């Protein structure tokens, strides 16, 4: 038997003993969860997410729609310089007005590239960096 089954059984026993649901035993919980806008992977179509400016335009549209945050999935194949420029352009346009997040979806090929992107995210005030390498 795995440890998770034992853990669940112990929580069940504790809930029955205290006559309370487990979520109350664990502490606070949310009744609302904030949503954020998330892009698809960029492309090279003229009307798509084909440039840093196109990503920034879309971020502005999302901000106008009331989204408090914006997550970027960038181009699968592009130079590191272009990708970091994307982070800068979006941050210049909407940074400070909404949280910015980046999910490279394991598209960075080296630890060094991931480190450079992490530093850029820090420099431009990104809220999180997800799955870089």
Feature locations, PLM:
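A general structural motif
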Residues: 83, 132-133
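N-terminal capping/lid subdomain adjacent to the active-site entrance of alpha/beta enzymes
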Residues: 1-101, 105-123
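A conserved nucleotide-sugar
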Residues: 126
């Amino acid at each position: 038997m795995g440890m998770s089954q034992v853990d669940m059984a112990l929580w069940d026993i504790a809930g029955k003993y205290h006559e309370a649901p487990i979520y109350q035993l664990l502490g606070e919980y949310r009744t609302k969860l904030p949503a954020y806008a998330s892009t698809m992977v960029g492309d090279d179509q003229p009307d798509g997410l084909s440039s840093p400016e196109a990503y920034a335009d879309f971020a502005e549209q999302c901000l106008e729609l009331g989204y408090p945050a914006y997550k970027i999935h960038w181009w699968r194949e592009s130079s590191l310089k272009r990708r970091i420029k994307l982070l800068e352009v979006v941050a210049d346009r909407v940074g400070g007005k909404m949280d910015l997040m980046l999910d490279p979806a394991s598209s960075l090929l080296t630890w060094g590239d991931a480190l450079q992107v992490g530093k850029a995210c820090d420099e431009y005030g990104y809220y999180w960096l997800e799955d870089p390498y």
